[in-house]
Amino acid sequence: MTNLKITDKFKDSLYPILTFLAIIIVWQAVVEIKDIPQYILPTPIDIIKVSITDYQNLFDNTLVTLYETILGFILALLVALTLGIIMDFVSVIRKCLYPILVVSQTIPTITIAPLLIIWFGFEALPKILMVALTCFFPILISFVDGLENIDKDYLNLFKTMKSSKLQTFIHLKLPMSIDKLFSGIKISVTYMVVAATVAEWLGGTKGLGVYMVRAKSAYALDKVFASTIIVVVLSLIFVGLVNIAKKIIIKHK
């Protein structure tokens, strides 16, 4: 049975891989047959070549974006968890803040980036805050939702046992909300590298976003594609890490 499951998983993985390879082959063929200039559409081989020749520059800028992304995510996670716990313990605060937080999400995050750059300059801080703002809401809402939607039978059981609010939170609400919390975290990490990159587009001196803008200005689309692929790969890695962390925590909760 285990071997069959592994075979099925392998087959399921094979379809998207083959599709991706087919797209790459068609892309390469079309550009070469139509003789499309590199400044309009580079071939996959061009992108691989520039990734190797400009490796150091790409690597240095990737480290800057990673630094901003990770710090922004940690900040968002800490603030979201803290505020989520406060909102769970103090219902008045939840009633006051929750509607405001929901309405705040109608403001496009990209419109906030120029303000952050004006207020905090062109260094890392505005990019970190941009990532934090992008990650904060999905984490908070998922966490609060998880804390609120606890089976009433379990809550009644803890009341019968005369558990304090803190004991109920630690031993019931927090473990039961982990699944929802990780759903919010997964949404956040999907967009956080993009958020850092967009902030770098609008104002920065280093990072993948700055690298893209400079490459675009020089019509070096092979470099633009190379940096875009790095953003995608980083996002996928972060999603994978969240999935691993979720499995480990749920296994031991």
Region annotations inferred by a language model:
Residues L147-D153, L157-S177, S217:
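Short helix-to-coil transition segments within interhelical loops
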Residues I118, V194-V231, I250-K253:
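Glycine-rich helix-loop "coupling/hinge" segments at transmembrane-helix boundaries
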Residues I33-I74:
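Periplasmic/extracellular loop-to-transmembrane helix junction in inner-membrane transport proteins
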Residues V102-P138, D145-G146:
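Generic hydrophobic transmembrane alpha-helix motif, especially the helices
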Residues L129, L133, L166-V198, A226, ...:
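Transmembrane alpha-helices
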Residues G72-L101:
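Transmembrane-helix boundary motif in ABC transporter permease subunits
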Residues M1-L21, G240-K253:
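Transmembrane alpha-helical segments of polytopic membrane transport and secretion proteins
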Residues S91, E148, S183, F225-K253:
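C-terminal transmembrane helix and the adjacent membrane-cytosol boundary/short C-terminal tail
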